[in-house]
A protein has these predicted regions:
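Extreme N-terminal segment that seeds HTH/winged-HTH DNA-binding domains in transcriptional regulators
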Residues: 2-79, 83-95, 100, 106-111
Length: 111
């Protein structure tokens, strides 16, 4: 199955869930930030994806932790995480797939 951008979706059984404990980067410091929490968290998630894709720790089509897991770990609302994910989805780092979760995408192939 492909989406509107031409990404091929693997079968659900082929997808690997990335646990919150798998994240190799330190959590962001959300105190004294100049931008919104959503943008700061979005940039942090994008940096984590870039770093861990390059190192091979995560792979394309990995399912990132749930919004609730991120919100709990970062001490913010699920809405803040939802906005952060929307921000990085627009940049091509992830793609939300209903009934599956949010998948890591190859951000280097964006036009």
């Amino acid at each position: 199955m492909t989406n509107k951008e031409g990404f091929m979706f693997p079968q659900k059984s082929e997808l690997r869930k990335i646990e919150i404990s798998d994240i190799s980067m330190e959590l962001p410091n959300l105190k004294d930030i100049e931008e919104s929490k959503s943008v700061a968290i979005g940039k942090w998630i994008a940096d984590w994806i870039k770093t861990d894709l390059q190192s091979g720790k995560i792979k394309i089509n990995g399912i990132i932790p749930s919004k609730a897991d991120f919100a709990y770990r970062l001490g913010v609302s699920v809405g803040t995480i939802q906005n952060a994910l929307r921000y990085i989805e627009d940049l091509g780092y992830v793609e939300s797939k209903q009934c599956i979760g949010t998948l890591v995408r190859d951000y280097t192939k964006q036009a």
